Amino acid sequence: MTALFGARYAWEQDIPVNIHFLWELEEEIGSPHFESTIKANAKEFATDTVVVSDTVWVSRARPAQPAGLRGLQGFRFSLQTGETDQHSGTAGGAARNPVTELCQVISECVDGRTGRVKIPGFYADVVPPTKRELEDLKNCGFTTKDFKRDHMFRSLRVDDPLEIMKRVWMMPTFEVHGIAGGYQGPGVKTVIPPKATAIVSCRLVPNMNPKKIVRLVTEFVKGKNPDVKVSAEHELPAYQGKTTGPYADAIRGAMKFAFGKEPVFVREGGSIGAVLSMEKVFKSDVFFLGLSLPEHGYHAPNENFDWRQAEGGMAAFADYFRRVADLGKPNSRKRL
């Protein structure tokens, strides 16, 4: 909505830009039809640059200009050792327990206390943050106290602010999202289940190849327990955008104009599949002008957005459109 109002103000001031708005509504299911849709309408959507407004500031203290997204590689680990539930009193000790075995395999993959992935070669292609990125992290206004409050954490694996930001934005992960198997209702039911499943994902950073990660994880898991079936799901490479150039400078200037402070370059810990599709189909660089704050409950049931950010966002978009128009030749209309 802030971008719409910004476009309205640009139109009222006769700023010479052509603006296309594109809503992507399949993100939470993997955007299965997005790329084919924009490819079929590529001529209509032809553009000089793309701006995505789907990112979060580090804190209210400084505007954030993300320049990268983590990727994602999903997995399903499945293990079946029998045909039906067994009573632990009659078979316990002799029967294999697939839940226990999956937990053992997972503990071999990742250190549950530190989060360090133990699969050989997993970190081989990770590019360390640049000196400028580290300086921006130190000056972005992030605090451990606010991070714990905004996300309602009781404790963290680390408390150092810089280390937290590096882990969330610039390092890959191995996360277990759920384990299914056996009895999960109230009370006690002493069964040994015949099968179990674990849902796992790895967040990836730029320069990591999802297919290589699939190979490394599969070979490692099979080496620990050859009976575990590993299925790869939801492949999405990481994205590294530009931090220099006329369009990046236009966003930077617009954010400073609207919020009174120079934005810091950061990365996002999440993934946006549509970004890679737009870069590929439109052959245009993709930039980010997000406005959400950590306390807005991003993607949570109580997600919200305050009027101060909306007001600043309208001004930022209107000023960005003006700056982009200034990049064109006299009497030309830039396309966004």
Protein language model regions, located:
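Short beta-strand/turn micro-motifs at beta-sheet edges
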Residues: 63-67, 185-190
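Acidic-enriched catalytic cores of C-N bond-cleaving enzymes acting on peptides and small amides
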Residues: 42-43, 67, 74, 88-179, ...
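Acidic/histidine-rich catalytic neighborhood of metal-dependent amide-processing enzymes
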Residues: 1-68, 329
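Short, low-order "capping/linker" segments at domain edges
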Residues: 239-257
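Zn-dependent metallopeptidase/amidohydrolase metal-coordination segment
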Residues: 78-80, 85-87, 102, 170, ...
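C-terminal catalytic subdomain
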Residues: 104, 186-215
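Alpha-helical metal-binding/catalytic segments enriched in His/Glu/Asp
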Residues: 1-30, 75-79, 92-113, 200, ...
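A short beta-alpha structural unit
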Residues: 201-205, 229-244, 268-269
